[in-house]
């Protein structure tokens, strides 16, 4: 197993190195696939030119005889062995092409593809490790002429060409890795800028040059790993360009994507020259695998020194940021003290204003009480006046009721008299036949009675008109005086009863006229019989005339009573007008009371707003004190944090799962401990970093709570 290589950088993610794999035992060399072109994945190198493992051991010093256990040399030995085996098998396959059957060729091609994938994986790990180590020692900004960077692009190009299908066209066969890279534009819209800029370069004439330019631009954007991950996730589209056993179609592709994430710490400034990109020949440099143990020891010491320097730089940056934060906090404290003094002055002014407003409020209350007492007195006086008027009105109404009862009794008596007269008329009709002269007199008397009846009818109509006028006047009095509605309603009911009784009397008079007509008809028949009874009838007629005169006198008295009632109604109207004026005065007093109440409510609102402002000022002061205490606690906590080394962590601190190739190490920028990707996937902006950085779950929740408390 190859030991895990380490690459550290203060303030950046730590990249795990692959564990050592068991060395492949030498077996039967697989035959190459028929039609395989030489130099498809690698250039063929003469095996005799490569140093053997024995020569390497003899070349090294005696004290480092066991140095092959080191990670770089072990990987170099495996890479040289695999490459030499693949080259030898390719030469033998070229010599004995066509000897094996179809099944043997497939098995040999699969074995060869597996060996090539393993070799490319080891070379990719070595190139990335050497690139990161050299970049961290010299500086993280790289140019296009940097040898480890060029070697990385060569290995990356071989990885993308591995297992690539050959496309036939009219011109000939075309085999370029720019075709799969064009798919990234469809899968990830962010890569459209790279594709368009590569197509618009006029100096690029070949597809290989465009593919290399695409890799340069993706590395400069620090999104090479993201784009390749999107491409590998869509293997159905990749199957159109790659064989099933290709490196991009197997698990090694995801491992390479994980290794490429570590290159995001580097800043590359690459120049895109079309001639250089089109004419470059991708040759893998195996001199990286031939470092001695002394360089390895010096590399370890250099790594330790860089770790110590990174820790020192981290602590210095922390102290610098803490000093900056302390200065900012001191300025904030000064500003808060100034604002506190201003707020205290405003508070004293507000208290003076409140005292003056309270005095004004007390004066307004006293004025309000005086006005209220006056209004209450005026209301009581008006109530007493209305009570007296109501009592007088009730008394007048009782008198009217008594008068109406007397009139009703008189009408009943008249009805009785009329009934008696009808009876007497019947008797007289029986006696009218005695004398014609008496009948003439009776006719004259009847004409006179008709005249009197007409006069009585006219008087009744006048009484009706008067009653209607009274009714309308009572309705107007009801609208002005609501308290007298019930009395007027009862009065109207009684008037309607009188009207109904008058109508009944008219109907009875009509019946009497009809009876009189019948009596006249009978009188014609009984003229002979009434001739002897004329004197008696004259006496009776005189009596009837006396009764009619008495009825006329009673009607005159009723008219006088009606006139008296009209006068009383006029007086009541005058009193109602006076009451309306008094009610208007009361309404004016009510409006003044409402205005005073509104002013009082506005003053209360002003007082409440000033009290709320004072409360808010107190809350702001308490919150500023709490913020100061929180900032002091944060400074204390930051001073106690230490940056944990990669060697000291073998498992995640939160989920306690062991780290591996797929589960990488990540530092929390707040507490300095190491976590896996799932436990430290959150990003927050810290005061010591200009951009959002990786933070563990516990620190994420704690920082969010602090932010929410400060925001509230």
From Swiss-Prot:
Top-level taxon of origin: Eukaryota
Location within or outside the cell: Early endosome membrane
Zn finger intervals (FYVE-type): 646-704
Positions of modified residues (Phosphotyrosine): 393, 404
Presence of the UniProt keyword Glycoprotein in the record: no
Assigned keywords, A-Z: Coiled coil, Endocytosis, Endosome, Lipid-binding, Membrane, Metal-binding, Phosphoprotein, Protein transport, Transport, Zinc, Zinc-finger
Main location: membrane
Gene3D superfamilies per the UniProt record, alphabetical: 1.20.5.170, 1.20.58.900, Zinc/RING finger domain, C3HC4 (zinc finger) (3.30.40.10)
Coiled-coil region: 325-378, 409-621
InterPro entries per the UniProt record, alphabetical: FYVE_RUFY1 (IPR047331), RUFY1-3 (IPR047335), Run_dom (IPR004012), Run_dom_sf (IPR037213), RUN_RUFY1 (IPR047330), Znf_FYVE (IPR000306), Znf_FYVE-rel (IPR017455), Znf_FYVE_PHD (IPR011011)
Comp. bias (Basic and acidic residues): 1-23, 504-527
Residue ranges of domain RUN in the record: 143-275
One GO-annotated biological process of the protein: early endosome to Golgi transport
Disordered, as annotated region: 1-45, 498-532
Interaction with RAB4: region residues: 619-629
Entry binding sites for Zn(2+) 1: 652, 655, 676, 679
List of residues binding Zn(2+) 2: 668, 671, 696, 699
Post-translational events: Phosphorylation on Tyr-393 and/or Tyr-404 is required for interaction with BMX and endosomal targeting.
GO molecular function, one term: lipid binding
Entry note about domains: The FYVE-type zinc finger domain mediates interactions with phosphatidylinositol 3-phosphate in membranes of early endosomes and penetrates bilayers. The FYVE domain insertion into PtdIns(3)P-enriched membranes is substantially increased in acidic conditions. The 2 coiled coil domains mediate the interaction with the dynein-dynactin complex, the RUN domain is also involved in the interaction. The coiled coil domains also mediate self-association.
Subunit and partners: Self-assembles through coiled coil domains to drive ELVA (endo-lysosomal vesicular assembly) formation. Interacts with BMX. May interact with SSB. Interacts with RAB4 and RAB5 that have been activated by GTP-binding. Interacts WITH RAB14 and RAB4B (GTP-bound form); the interactions allow endosomal tethering and fusion. Interacts with ARL8B (GTP-bound form); the interaction is required for RUFY1 endosomal location and promotes interaction with RAB14.
Protein name: RUN and FYVE domain-containing protein 1
Species per Swiss-Prot/TrEMBL record: Mus musculus (Mouse)
């Amino acid at each position: 197993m190859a030991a895990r290589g380490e690459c550290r950088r203060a303030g950046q993610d730590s990249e795990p190195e692959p564990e050592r794999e068991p060395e492949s035992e030498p077996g039967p060399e697989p035959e190459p696939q028929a039609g395989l072109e030489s130099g498809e994945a690698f250039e063929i190198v003469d095996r005799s030119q490569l140093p053997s493992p024995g020569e390497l051991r003899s070349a090294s010093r005696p004290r480092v005889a066991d140095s092959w256990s080191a990670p770089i040399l072990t990987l170099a030995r495996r890479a040289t062995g695999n490459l030499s085996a693949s080259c030898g098998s390719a030469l033998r396959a070229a010599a004995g092409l066509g000897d094996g059957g179809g099944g043997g060729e497939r098995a040999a091609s699969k074995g060869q593809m597996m060996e090539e994938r393993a070799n490319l994986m080891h070379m990719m790990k070595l190139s990335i490790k050497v690139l990161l180590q050299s970049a961290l020692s010299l500086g993280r900004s790289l140019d296009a002429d940097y040898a480890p960077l060029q070697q990385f692009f060569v290995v990356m190009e071989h990885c993308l060409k591995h297992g690539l299908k050959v496309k036939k066209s009219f011109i000939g066969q075309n085999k370029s890795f720019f075709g799969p890279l064009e798919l990234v534009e469809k899968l990830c819209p962010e890569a459209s800028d790279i594709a368009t800029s590569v197509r618009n370069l006029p100096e690029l004439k070949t597809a290989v040059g465009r593919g290399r330019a695409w890799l340069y631009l993706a590395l400069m954007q620090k999104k090479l790993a993201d784009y390749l991950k999107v491409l590998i996730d869509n293997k159905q589209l990749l199957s159109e360009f790659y064989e099933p056993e290709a490196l991009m179609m197997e698990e090694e592709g995801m491992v390479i994507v994980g290794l490429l994430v570590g290159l995001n710490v580097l800043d590359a400034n690459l120049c895109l020259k079309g001639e250089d990109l089109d004419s470059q020949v991708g040759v893998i440099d195996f001199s990286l695998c031939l470092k001695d143990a002394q360089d390895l020891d010096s590399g370890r010491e250099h790594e330790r020194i860089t770790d110590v320097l990174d820790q020192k730089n981290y602590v210095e940056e922390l102290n610098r940021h803490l000093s900056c934060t302390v200065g900012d906090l001191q300025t904030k404290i000064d500003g808060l003290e100034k604002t506190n003094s201003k707020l205290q002055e405003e508070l004293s002014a507000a208290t003076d204003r409140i005292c003056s407003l309270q005095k004004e409020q007390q004066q307004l209350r006293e004025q309000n009480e005086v006005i209220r007492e006056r209004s209450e007195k005026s209301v009581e006086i008006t109530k007493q006046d209305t009570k007296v008027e109501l009592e007088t009105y009730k008394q007048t109404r009782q008198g009217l009721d008594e008068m109406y009862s007397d009139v009703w009794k008189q009408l009943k008596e008249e009805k009785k008299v009329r009934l008696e007269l009808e009876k007497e008329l019947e008797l007289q009709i029986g006696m009218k036949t005695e004398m014609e002269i008496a009948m003439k007199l009776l006719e004259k008397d009847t004409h006179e009675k008709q005249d009197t009846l007409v006069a009585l009818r006219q008087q009744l109509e006048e009484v009706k008109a008067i009653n209607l006028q009274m009714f309308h006047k009572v309705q107007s009095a009801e609208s002005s005086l609501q308290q007298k509605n019930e009395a007027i309603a009862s009065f109207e009911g009684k008037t309607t009863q009188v009207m109904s009784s008058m109508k009944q009397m008219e109907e009875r008079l009509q019946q009497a006229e009809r009876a009189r007509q019948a009596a006249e008809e009978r009188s014609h028949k009984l003229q002979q019989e009434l001739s002897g009874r004329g004197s008696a009838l004259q006496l009776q007629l005189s009596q009837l005339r006396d009764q009619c005169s008495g009825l006329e006198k009673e009607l005159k008295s009723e008219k006088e009573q009606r006139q008296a009632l009209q006068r009383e109604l006029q007086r009541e109207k005058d009193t109602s007008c006076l009451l309306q004026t008094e009610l208007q005065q009361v309404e004016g007093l009510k409006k003044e009371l409402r205005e005073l109440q509104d002013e009082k409510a506005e003053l209360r609102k002003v007082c409440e707003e000033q009290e709320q402002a004072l409360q808010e000022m107190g809350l702001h002061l308490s919150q500023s004190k709490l913020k100061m205490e929180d900032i002091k606690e944060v400074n204390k906590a930051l001073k106690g944090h230490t940056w944990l080394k990669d060697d000291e962590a073998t498992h995640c601190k939160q989920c306690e799962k062991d780290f591996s190739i797929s589960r990488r190490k990540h530092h929390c920028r707040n507490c300095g401990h190491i976590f896996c990707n799932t436990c430290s996937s959150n990003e927050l902006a810290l005061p010591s970093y200009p951009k959002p950085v990786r933070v563990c779950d516990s620190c994420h929740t704690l920082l969010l709570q602090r932010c929410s408390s400060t925001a509230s």
